[in-house]
């Protein structure tokens, strides 16, 4: 699962553990200004591990690839806007192709785990309907198309599925 350290992905992690999943979390450093979330992700995983939950955590550094993407979240030349989540100025926080990149990495990891361990793998993401207005890569049609592309482009895709429990609700 993708674990940003924010509220959505952290609640998803807790849900997956409650449902009995063996969880590997992946956090991404991509040049984001709000790296405090990565620190919170690490703290939360450490706390869960101290309570005997089996949670693995990997941090993948994509700063050299994504750090120059034009977005208020990554570009030092403009401020992160404040305001209501659905306001137009919040579109400045879109990082081009971010969820496709993250999902592609997770999918490759899932295929590798599936092949090594001869098992099915679920890729879980905390994207939710509240993100739809601002982030086009948080919409159901995006993930349907992405899943189709991954299935067409990879062998053994029948062993991989996406779990997007919040995509239709808040």
Task: Give, region by region, the residue ranges found by the protein language model.
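ATP-dependent adenylation/nucleotidyltransferase module used to activate substrates
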Residues: 1-170
């Amino acid at each position: 699962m993708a674990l940003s350290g924010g509220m959505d992905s952290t609640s998803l992690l807790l849900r997956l553990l409650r449902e009995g999943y063996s969880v590997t979390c992946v956090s991404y450093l991509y040049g984001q200004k709000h790296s405090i979330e990565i620190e919170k992700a690490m703290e939360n995983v450490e706390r869960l591990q101290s309570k005997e939950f089996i949670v693995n955590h990997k941090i993948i550094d994509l700063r050299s690839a994504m750090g120059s993407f034009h977005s208020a979240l990554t570009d030092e030349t403009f401020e992160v806007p404040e305001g209501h989540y659905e306001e137009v100025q919040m579109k400045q926080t879109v990082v081009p192709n971010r969820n496709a990149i993250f999902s592609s990495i997770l999918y490759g990891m899932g295929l590798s785990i599936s092949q090594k361990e001869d098992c099915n793998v679920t890729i879980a993401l905390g994207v939710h309907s509240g993100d739809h207005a601002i982030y086009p890569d948080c919409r159901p049609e995006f993930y349907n198309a992405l899943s189709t592309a991954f299935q067409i482009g990879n062998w053994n895709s029948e062993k991989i599925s996406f779990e997007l429990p919040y995509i239709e609700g808040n």
